[in-house]
């Protein structure tokens, strides 16, 4: 386990469990390009709204999955214990970043193992069809050949990594969480 730049907020491999296993917010490994700042603010906002929330910062959350096109450098992956920790919850919120191709391939690897409903938060404009094209199950678009166990139920775009999240985005995330926790 190494230390990464997290804006002083979190380090890779961190897992902080809430009192109830309702929601888990997942952040990529902190580093030069993946700062956990928006994830920490989102988590704080969710907790302030009265929803029990856990936090998981992935140990190998930077880079691309090995099966992604043009995958060079560091490799995105999940440890079995991270998968187990996430799957104990009812709903997952994960922030994937800004590069569209990275977002979809990371989501596919993540949801191969994570079986719970997932809300994707990212900076780049993206829709359910972008995920379904590579086999990710979504609430709105069913892929021809599903390659994931988990399902994307909502997408929130425009959340910039390393920057403060506008209250409107935090409110949007909370609204979508409440819709799926009923």
Curated annotation (Swiss-Prot):
Database matches in InterPro entries: Me_CoM_Rdtase_prot-C, Me_CoM_Rdtase_prot-C-like
Keywords: Methanogenesis
Domain of life, source organism: Archaea
Record bears the keyword DNA-binding: no
Keyword check for Disulfide bond: no
GO biological process terms, semicolon-separated: methanogenesis
Signal peptide range: none
Quaternary structure note: MCR is composed of three subunits: alpha, beta, and gamma. The function of proteins C and D is not known.
This protein's name: Methyl-coenzyme M reductase operon protein C
Species annotation: Methanococcus voltae
Recorded name of the encoding gene: mcrC
